[in-house]
Structure formats: C-alpha cells, structure tokens
C-alpha cells in the first residue's frame, strides 16, 4: 500500500518476510457481477465493488471469527492516516501498558511514596480481541504430530515440544497468516501422567542456529493433555470443552510469557513491536473421544497484564486471579465486557478473578492435502532415553545408510541437531550440511561428503559401531 512504502522500521529489528509481503498487498475482496448490477462489464456498483479485508459481513458469512492482523492494521490506517494527512502520520498500533511509571516527572516521589494521575495506569477493560496475529496452524505432515504423541501412547506420560517452522500467507482469510510446522523439538523435561516439568535447556541456542540455517525458527509450543478413556479402542477423555476450560489459567499465563519473549516486529507500532506470532497448541481429547490439536494465542492485553505482573493462576483452571497492589506493583481497577442474557454489553468487575476466555484467541489448524514436508523423520527423537529411544553413534550410522546414496538421508531435523552437537564438523561444514538440506543442490552434497570433517565423522562411526 502507499503508506506501507513510506513507513519502514527505524530500528535494526527486521520484519518477517511474510509481513513485508502483506504490507504491500491491499487485500481487497473481489466480488462477481450479480443479477442486481445494472451496468456493463467494465462498470462497478455497490453490489460488486471489492470489499475491504476487514468487512465483518464477509468474515461472518465465511465463518471467520477474527479478522487478520494485517486487515486490522489496514482498517486502523484507513481511519487514522488518510491520503490527505500523509505528512502527519500516526502509528496505528500501540501496545497496552498497565505498569505504573516509576520515573514520573510529576514532581513527586516515585511510587509507592507518591502517585499522580499522570503515572497511574488507567482502569482496564478487557474484551475478547477481534483480530489475531496468526490465523492458522498447519503441521507440514501428520507424521510430525503422530511421532510427538507416540510418547504418550507408549508410556502414558505427557509431553512438551517446541514448534520450528515458518510463517506463510493463508489464503482462506483476507491477508491471513499461517504458521507451518516442520519439526517438533522436545527439550529436556520430566514427563509425568498429569503434566510436564521443564528442565534447563542448555543447547537451545545451538538448536535455534541449526533451525535458522534451514530457514526455520520457533513459531510456538505444543503439549499433550491426554487421558485414556479405558475403552480399549484408543479413545481419550474429553476434558476441555465449553463447560470446563480450553486453556487453563496456568497455560494462558505461560502462553503470554512466551509471546512477550518472542515479540512481533512491525513498522506499524511506534515501538516497532506489537504483540507476537507465537502459538500455543494443546493435544487433547475431542467430544467424540478422538485425539485432536487445538491452537491458541492470548491477546495483547494478556501480554500487558503479565508484563505488569497483575495476574496469577487460580485454583480454578478456567479463572485468572488478579493480584493485589503491593510494593512497586500498582494494580488498577479491572473490568471485563460481556454480553448478558438480554444481548446487551455490560461491564463486570474482574476482581478477584475473571474467566480465562477473555484473554484467548482461537486459531484454525489442519494438515495439508498434499504434504511436502521438509524432513523425513527417521532419527531417534531427543530426551526419550526413558523409552529406550537413544541418540548415539549407532543411530547416526543407521541414518546414513538410508536413502539412495544422495542427500535425502540428511533430511531429518533431530539428526542435524545431533550432528551439530557432536562437534566434529567445523562451522563452515555445518553451514554446508544445512544448505545441502535446505536447497538440495548436488554440488553442495558432493562438497560435503568430500570435506575433511565429514570423512572424520565416517571414520569415527566405522570404529564405533
């Protein structure tokens, strides 16, 4: 769009390629000529003129609950930054901030010794967010998820994983974005029947570097919440539904912390950051006893509440507890808007607790009809020693016997991370290995197998297996 070409990020932070692409698109929804149209082929009227990507009637008609982030930005720009006032541009996005200003210039001692209307956060009114940063979660192949769920199938304990993938355009929502998951990495964890305890992940930076060399990055997390229905048919209990909860209060706060940790870089905010594209996916039981993934994010307001340390988990999984004002933490009045039994919008006092649902944003999820996954996934998965699934020299040797003597045997994320951890290949050779998988060029594969580090690896394998 015209404004997008003028406004570019002023900081060193880089927008994702998908955002750069969608910034340039208008996203107008074309409509066919109808019988009500009274004009020629080249004419246009109110019945067939294109609709803006935020048009509520169109979204409702197609069952789209939330407008996309870029449609939301374009709607705000339409309202605030018309072509007539191009010189007085106003950034359409501003992250909510619920913290008290401890460096207030109002001439009083810093809070808690002094306070004024300037440094005091305004009362908060929570309502369900009308847009979402990511519209869809797609696993590149069903095998990725099946292998992840296998831990529960074999042992009955729950599992947690980090989703590595990329963001792409999602055509079913105007200006939509989907997260495409190519691999699930399982960091160190103590798995139990009713949950997971995460342990220190010392090689996280190395895993991130391997992913980056493949054109991938963290797009979210996934965890299981599965209980066998004891019917002998593989069915599971449906524990998450409209009468219980979808994400528990602890999980919603975890999602908010993750989103704060991985902010979304955008030219449309004065701070160059707004909310996050980080997704939280839970694998749980559906209404028919089937195993199904459900994807969520939490709202920008949820992120702000966590940043301000205003909320905590409660004893009820479907309720978020609001903390008391204490020390340097000032908690303003908090309300939430809901529709009552008469169809009217009313405000309720959110203290001492309010429903988690007011912070949730629901995503769609699916598998592609014609999967073309990046990885073949044959190598043992990390942190599964308790199942007898070991990553060792024998596993590397077995992996290298696969394929047709070409680079296809290298196409496994868990294998690539393990080889990088072995510290046998040099930095340049690791880069060559990752490029070989990413681009699939024969000359890169030839250069790799002829490299000194690769020959050393093969020699070590010959003497170890």
Where do the PLM segments sit?
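Eukaryote-biased recognition of electropositive, low-complexity segments
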Residues: 274-424
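N-terminal beta-strand/alpha-helix entry module and adjacent surface
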Residues: 1-219, 224-322, 393, 413-419, ...
């Amino acid at each position: 769009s015209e404004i997008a070409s003028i406004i570019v990020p002023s900081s060193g932070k880089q927008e994702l390629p998908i955002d750069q692409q969608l910034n340039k698109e208008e996203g107008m929804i074309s409509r066919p000529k109808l019988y009500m149209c009274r004009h020629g082929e080249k004419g246009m009227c109110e019945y067939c003129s294109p609709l803006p990507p935020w048009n509520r009637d169109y979204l409702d008609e197609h069952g789209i609950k939330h407008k996309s982030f870029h449609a939301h930005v374009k709607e705000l720009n339409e309202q605030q930054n018309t072509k007539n006032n191009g010189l007085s541009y106003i950034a359409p996005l501003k992250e909510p901030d619920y913290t008290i200003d401890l460096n207030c210039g109002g001439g009083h001692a810093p809070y808690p010794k002094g306070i004024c209307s300037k440094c005091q956060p305004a009362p908060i009114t929570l309502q369900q967010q009308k847009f979402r940063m990511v519209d869809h979660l797609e696993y590149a192949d069903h095998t990725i998820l099946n292998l992840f769920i296998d831990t529960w199938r074999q042992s009955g304990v729950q599992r947690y994983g980090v989703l590595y993938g990329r963001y792409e355009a999602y055509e079913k929502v105007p200006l939509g974005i989907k997260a495409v998951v190519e691999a699930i990495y399982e960091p160190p964890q103590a798995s139990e029947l009713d949950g997971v305890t995460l342990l220190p992940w010392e090689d996280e930076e190395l895993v991130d570097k391997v992913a980056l060399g493949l054109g991938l990055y963290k797009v979210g997390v996934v965890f299981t919440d599965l209980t066998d229905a004891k019917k002998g048919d593989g069915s599971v209990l449906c524990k998450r539904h409209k009468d219980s909860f979808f994400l528990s209060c602890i999980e919603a706060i975890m999602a908010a912390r993750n989103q704060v940790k991985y902010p979304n870089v955008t030219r449309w905010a004065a701070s160059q950051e707004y909310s996050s594209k980080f997704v939280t996916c839970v694998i749980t039981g559906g209404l028919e006893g089937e195993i199904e993934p459900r994807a969520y994010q939490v709202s920008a307001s949820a992120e702000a509440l966590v940043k301000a340390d205003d909320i905590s988990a409660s004893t009820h999984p479907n309720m978020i507890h609001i903390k008391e004002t204490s020390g340097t933490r000032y908690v303003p009045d908090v309300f939430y808007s809901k529709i009552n039994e008469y169809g009217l919008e009313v405000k309720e006092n959110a203290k001492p607790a309010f429903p988690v649902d007011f912070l949730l944003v629901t995503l769609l999820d699916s598998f592609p009809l014609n999967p073309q996954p990046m990885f073949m996934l044959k190598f043992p998965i990390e942190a599964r020693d308790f199942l007898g699934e070991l990553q060792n020299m024998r596993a590397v040797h077995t992996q290298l016997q696969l394929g047709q003597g070409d680079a296809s045997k290298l196409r496994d994320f868990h294998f690539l991370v393990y080889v990088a951890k072995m510290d046998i290949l040099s930095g340049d050779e690791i880069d060559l290995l990752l490029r070989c998988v990413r681009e699939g060029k024969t000359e890169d594969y030839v250069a790799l197998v002829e490299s000194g580090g690769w020959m050393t690896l093969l020699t070590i394998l010959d003497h170890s297996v």
